[in-house]
Amino acid sequence: PERVKKLVVLAAPARHGPWARAFNHLSRQAILQDPEYQKGNPAPKGMALARGIAMMSYRAPEGFEARWGAEPELGETYLDYQGEKFLRRFHAESYLVLSRAMDTHDVGRGRGGVEEALKRLRAIPSLFVGIDTDLLYPAWEVRQAAKAAGARYREIKSPHGHDAFLIETDQVEEILDAFLP
């Protein structure tokens, strides 16, 4: 706290909880169960499926309906495309290590628990921003962390789920401008 003037936490909870870990677990299983991975190869089918599972955690039903409601099969094609694209820029081992590292995120570890760790932030002007349709890190988790930290809380309204912080740039800009004048 003594080195930070202001803090913004955007679409992230104080710890990687059981819901978010479950998505990572399924993604890892997709890779580990790929017969190619078991032979020591890159696991293309498992990696593509892992990315599809992850994409489902980053998005929300409202956004899928708005974009592909008239042609639902295009949503499936989109997930396949994302999986194929992912293969060109990520290695299975890197993905496994990164997802396990994410699962260990817990600001309370070694600090007396989450509540105690967040109380230390009360001396810092802080803003926590949740997203109303975020399936990965539900708004209530971010709001709960903000309350424990004695921080302000704002919420992005969007049909795009967790990815809204990347898509709803006007809302993000408005929220940040109000906090970081």
What positions do the PLM features span?
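Conserved alpha/beta-hydrolase "acid-adjacent" motif
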Residues: 135-141
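Short beta-strand/loop motif that positions the catalytic acidic residue
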Residues: 128-130
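Acidic beta-to-alpha connecting loop that harbors the catalytic carboxylate
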Residues: 132-134, 160
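Short, proline-enriched alpha-helix->beta-strand connector loops that line the catalytic pocket
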Residues: 93, 120-126, 149-150
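Catalytic active-site module of serine/aspartate enzymes centered on a nucleophile-bearing elbow/loop
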Residues: 143-181
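Active-site nucleophile elbow and catalytic-triad environment of alpha/beta-hydrolase enzymes
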Residues: 81, 97-118
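Alpha/beta-hydrolase-fold enzymes
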Residues: 8-85
